[in-house]
Amino acid sequence: VPETNAAWRKQNLGYRLFAANDRFVRDKLASVNEGGFAGITDALLSLLINIDGVGTRVTDIAARAGLTKQSVVELIDRAEKLGVVRREADPDDKRTRIVCFTPLGTRLCHCLQQAIIGAEQRFA
């Protein structure tokens, strides 16, 4: 049966939330890239927002991000190659590694924070 009114496909809350999130992500990535951080993806940003300033265990990052440990390790490998994180021994358990920000990673987090603030202001 042919539809006479297909407007419902884009005139609903779910579509509008998706479109707003898509724009938010694009704005955030554009700001980060303009800040000198080329090669940063939304997946990497989702990793970074789950790392504490003092460092975080891989299993904790995975739980916070809702990702598998294997996926998080792949993201950490990419972030390490970009020079924004490093792995080091956990001071509380030498058998465990934690992921910490490098000075470049700290600057990226500051840039990300400013990008998020700017994107939120544009939406307000």
Give names to the regions the model predicted.
Residues 27-71:
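N-terminal helix-turn-helix DNA-binding core of bacterial DNA-binding proteins
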Residues 11-14, 18, 22, 66, ...:
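Short amphipathic alpha-helical segments with heptad-repeat character
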Residues 10, 43, 92-94:
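Short, solvent-exposed coil/turn segments
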Residues 74:
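DNA-binding alpha-helical recognition surfaces that contact promoter or target DNA
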